[in-house]
From Swiss-Prot:
Organism of this sequence: Rhodopseudomonas palustris (strain BisB18)
Binding site for NADP(+): R48, R54
Listed InterPro entries: Chorismate_synth, Chorismate_synth_AroC_sf, Chorismate_synthase_CS
Designated name of the protein: Chorismate synthase
Catalytic reaction(s) noted: 5-O-(1-carboxyvinyl)-3-phosphoshikimate = chorismate + phosphate
GO molecular function: chorismate synthase activity; FMN binding
KW Lyase (keyword) present: yes
């Protein structure tokens, strides 16, 4: 199975399966002399960790990260710092229940990657989905914590802005509220609504989709490159690679199709520190290059495919059958995608910073 690596200069390779011994990643291209400890990475992993509320999978994983290589104690400062060598990270799996999947080992779960993995490789890991499981995203979050260290002047934040058909009231947007509710929602009132709404979905054994918005503040003008190395191209690809994501937009995205040229234009005026934009429909990127405004992206997460309702499917022999999925699953996988989105955008920005320096210096 190829294509387990993303990035150009700041490269991340992930490995491991949902029900394997461990998962992990190797980060290659991280600059040297950056202070880095396991605690720096653990903070981000704890936000994504499963089993923290009734609204996420009840699989209990501590997600304790171990740094295996790429760091050492600096002889002068006494701080643990990166050396420029590949940084290997390991997270042990401790709460697998493979027996929950024994009844479906010969059946394809609708909406999952079971059929396509089987069609391509002739084999699939039916125990929790293997590499296609959201469990893999813990390694991305770990890599993202390192990426944040590479771009310390940039703040990458994400929030859940829609669940099912219900959107937040953007007039109530409060970043401080994101950490105060189990949905990472910036609208306090809507977060309360989501509790009852998702409880109903969960008790019915079903699931629901969501929309996540990610914003990067502090990205300077000039990152990215024309045509085939666009900043928004890489952000879109990174977000699209997250499990269960089915759509990505930058800035106003698909809504711009309903606007006129006058409405969509991000007009400019002279400011004390250079040109100032009067709006940000473009999401902080024009021609594939950052404008200095906040970089904004959104993505849609489909409903979790593993639900308790019986569904029609076929088995490996091509016979019609029904399937009932057991196991522990997120009623809204979009909740835990918030921290994953931040990590992926942070990795893209770290990659583009290094590429930018390589092209123009500084």
């Amino acid at each position: 199975m190829s294509f387990n690596t993303f990035g150009h200069m700041f490269r991340v390779t992930t490995f491991g399966e949902s029900h394997g011994v461990a998962i992990g990643c190797v980060v290659d291209g991280c600059p040297p002399l950056i202070a880095l400890t396991e605690a720096d990475i653990q903070r981000d992993l704890d936000r994504r960790r499963p089993g923290q509320s009734r609204f996420t999978t009840q699989r209990q994983e501590a997600d304790q990260v171990k740094i295996l290589s790429g760091v050492m104690v600096h002889p002068q400062s006494g701080l643990q710092v990166t050396t420029g060598a590949p940084i290997a990270l390991l997270i042990e799996n401790t709460d697998q229940r493979s027996k929950d999947y024994s009844e479906i080992k010969d059946k394809f779960r609708p909406g999952h990657a079971d059929f396509t993995y089987e069609a391509k490789y002739g084999i699939r890991d039916y125990r929790g989905g293997g590499r296609s499981s959201a469990r893999e995203t813990a390694t991305r979050v770990a890599a993202g914590a390192i990426a944040r260290k590479v771009v310390p002047g940039i703040t990458v934040r994400a929030a859940l802005v829609q669940m099912g058909p219900h959107q937040i009231d953007r007039d109530n947007w409060d970043w401080e509220e994101v950490g105060n509710n189990p949905f990472f929602c910036p609208d306090k009132d809507k977060a309360k609504f989501f509790e009852d709404y998702l409880d109903g979905i969960r008790k019915n054994g079903s699931s629901i989709g969501a929309v996540i918005e990610v914003v990067a503040d502090g990205v300077p003008a000039g990152w990215g490159a024309p045509i085939y190395a666009k900043l928004d191209t890489d952000i879109a690809a990174a977000l699209m690679s997250i499990n269960a994501v089915k759509g990505v937009e930058i800035g106003d995205g698909f809504a711009t199709a309903a606007l006129t040229g006058e409405q969509n234009a991000d007009e400019m005026r002279a400011g004390n520190d250079g040109p100032s934009f009067l709006s940000n429909h473009a999401g902080g990127i024009l021609g594939g290059i950052s404008t200095g405004q906040p970089v904004v992206a959104r993505f849609a997460v489909k409903p979790t495919s593993s639900i308790l309702a019986p569904r029609k499917t076929v088995d490996r022999d091509g016979h019609d059958t029904d399937i009932l999925t057991k196991g522990r699953h997120d009623p809204c996988v979009g909740i835990r995608a918030v921290s994953v989105a931040e990590a992926m955008v942070a990795c893209v920005l770290a990659d583009h910073l290094i590429r930018h320096r390589g092209q123009i210096g500084g």
